[in-house]
């Protein structure tokens, strides 16, 4: 029996090894490609500034700047995701009040919320205390709020529901299915690709949020409260 067990383990390891190596190669490629892209983007940005100084059509310059900004954001997200994949993003933990963190971020993004005609409504407990890394949770909540700002349709309200050990951020959305929600944390997944082109979404934000949660022993889930209402729940495991 022992011999059979050893043989099965060896066969399994051999079968799995190519898959593991392939995943590792893909991760390394993303990391290397992201670093390589940063230099030409910096050159393009400098050239665009030069075109602006030379009196080139403002619409052309502004369009270039928007695309460069979008690419820079994508590269930064890819690098961040790569660091989490490699386990480099772990850090010290402490008691963190997620409600306070969310309110601080809302105050920072208030001009953008006002510009979009959006409101943030807080309900439930005054605090949500969990033991985690504050910087990581700040980034996670920022991603969720940014996602809500981009994709809220209909009722212009982002909801923040606090309980003792969980925080939920919700918004009205285009009609979605449970299958779509089940894929929402997949890398580069887009519920509506045409809408992502207009909002500037890269399809990586929620993947990064999920990776942050996993790295910091926090559970992040997405659920439909109705066909046109989604919420993201941060909770202790």
Tell where the protein language model's regions lie, with residue ranges.
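Short helix-loop "hinge" at the ATP-lid/N-box region of the Bergerat-fold HATPase_c
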Residues: 148-149
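Conserved micro-motifs of the catalytic ATP-binding
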Residues: 86-91, 129-133
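Short beta-strand/loop element within the Bergerat-fold HATPase_c
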Residues: 155-166
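Conserved catalytic submotifs in the C-terminal HATPase_c
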Residues: 94-95, 114, 119-129, 163
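Short conserved segment of the HATPase_c
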Residues: 176-190
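Short alpha-helical segment of the dimerization/phosphotransfer core of two-component systems
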Residues: 66-74
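Glycine-rich ATP-binding loops of the HATPase_c
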Residues: 217-224
